[in-house]
Amino acid sequence: MEIISLPIWVIFFLIFGILALVTALTALFFPIFSRPKKYTNSEVPAVDSEDFLQALAGVANAPVQSGGQAKLLNNGEQFFPEILEAINKAEKTINFMTYIWTKGKMSDLVFEGLIKALHRKVEVRIVLDGFGGTGIDDEKLEIFKKAGGKVCWFRPAHLGKLTRFYRRNHRRAIIMDGFVGFIGGAAIEDKWLGNAENPEHWRDSMVKVTGSMAENLQSAFIQVWTDTYGEFLVGRKFYPHQGKHEGTTDSTTSKHVSIISSPSSEFHPISNVFWLSIKAGREKIYLTYSYFVPDKTLRNILKEKAREGIDVRILLPNDYIDGNTIRWASHRYFEELLQAGVKIYEYQPTMIHSKTIVVDGKFSIVGSANFDIRSTELNKENILCIAEKGFASDLENTFFQDLKHAKQMKLGAWKKRSFFRRIRERFASLFEEQY
């Protein structure tokens, strides 16, 4: 038998290709850390108790704090003018971190405000994600840098670092003078303008925070900035004394816990915070998420609470979603949730991109994290847990306003979906670790 002789360079590239394929498949299909099969606890305190907040702080490795205010802002019509106003009022520092930044009207207005701030001698820094920020207007970015602005990119694509590339910086943290900040689901792209009036304008929420809540956002920004840019940000201009700012508020003072997560560690607190907060529910639990692919432990606690007679409702996107495969993966779990009594709705007018939980009208979670494995294990994320009835009431009212424009999924009809749809769901769920 004749033996085929291959050039050494061909053998090298074959071996390199096989190793690259094995590495990619390992990264895609193996979880970052081993999850427990279930969480157990005889009783979790109610969300309005001090014991609950201390338990939350324990699993999040973050302290319970008091002070600061939170104001809910729905859709670009509300939050974008507030962001621009805060930029225009900044006196010392602006730190701007978002996942997506794409050229357009919204980008132009933000750059205009940031460049004017630089001319006022305000220090301005931007963190861009190496994947989500690639649509930015390069010309405007150069003008910004020439005016004195600083920019860093989180994990841009590099050959040999592809297993790190798929772990993204998904955090949202916009902070002015260390005292006023914004957190939520929105980013810099024209689809976040307007009032969700059509499919070209998304439904989303941001939260304006002040005081110690804003300082927590500052920490989420500075952690990424220091690790990526190599500059330590210290001093009163980043962490001002709160006393001199008291009284400049929109709402009542709140107790809160701020959580930031990173893929560099096997400690992933967001999943634990989600579970504990849902477990603590006594009457009603309302979730709104753009991407919903929970692991088994989170699905089980949602089903458990629904079987207890708690009003558990989940609001998700319909086919206006910007990624059909994640929606199909989500659909795989609808039947088991509906059978347990969970009520599921799909928002009809446009893509809904909000990321919120409100429990018993007393406790809320807002931030960048989705209800999926990518957010709990892979991405850098930041969320804010707020124990304040006024804010929770605003969030709950918004939830029911959104339900007026949503279609409820019914178990009987859902069971009749086609064989093709079921196969599609199973195929999509193979990649649920990555959505």
Language-model regions, residue ranges each:
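Charged, low-complexity intrinsically disordered terminal segments
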Residues: 2-435
